[in-house]
Amino acid sequence: STNVRVRVRDRFLNIRESSNIKFKNIDFSAGSINLRGSKYFTLEDCKFSFSSDMGLLGNSVAYSHFLKVRNCIFEYNNDGHSWSQQLSPHPVLENVLFRYNDWFGGTAWSPTTDRNYRGDSMVKAEAQGDQSWYGTQWRYITIENSYTAGIFAGPRSLIEYARLENLYEGCDCSGIQRNAAGARYSTTRFSWIINSPGLNGVRFDSKCGARFGDLHNVVSIGNRRGLRLK
């Protein structure tokens, strides 16, 4: 056959402790990237296809402050996160499309920016007056036609102008997931969650001491639950 794709490895790019780098207009196919301790990193006009598969590692980021992902596409990623960013203050994802991801149920594999603070825990960060985890932004995001959950944005994050449509996952997850930590000091606005029959449109957890999160101008249609407020 003349139409054969051979995959020889899972991760073809590791970058550590290297800052002020910009990748623009690059197609990453059949492999994933890993960033550690790389500050002020920008991905712009890039496409990530077939980044992960069964038993292979997906795209991941940790300890990389002020990372920006703009005008990018993540597609055909199976059994892994198309994008997972942890312990990295001030990430920005803007005008990003996630489509045709995952084949299996019960795994979620939502695009994620979580634990966006420095230090061992959010409680310790607050006690030390650490403001570094204020700045997560998800703006102009589309997630569609996938067997995944939606956005897991983390604490003190902003989600706005997001459209999530035709998500077929059925686990205990949501189009926009604001669990106890992720709801705290968050803002979710001007977003649409459409036709996710196995998911909550939005999950928003509260607590006796309150979460201080804002949720407004959100449309939820054709989902298992429109808004799950706990």
Predicted features by range, described:
Residues 5-22, 30-40, 53-61, 80, ...:
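Extracellular beta-strand-rich solenoid/capping regions of secreted or surface-exposed proteins
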Residues 208:
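Active-site-proximal loop/turn and secondary-structure-junction residues that shape catalytic pockets
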Residues 108, 175-180:
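Long, charge-dense partner-interaction scaffolds in eukaryotic RNA-expression machinery
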Residues 19-27, 39-52, 63-78, 88-115, ...:
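Right-handed parallel beta-helix
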Residues 170-172:
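A flexible loop/linker signature enriched in serine peptidases of the S9 family
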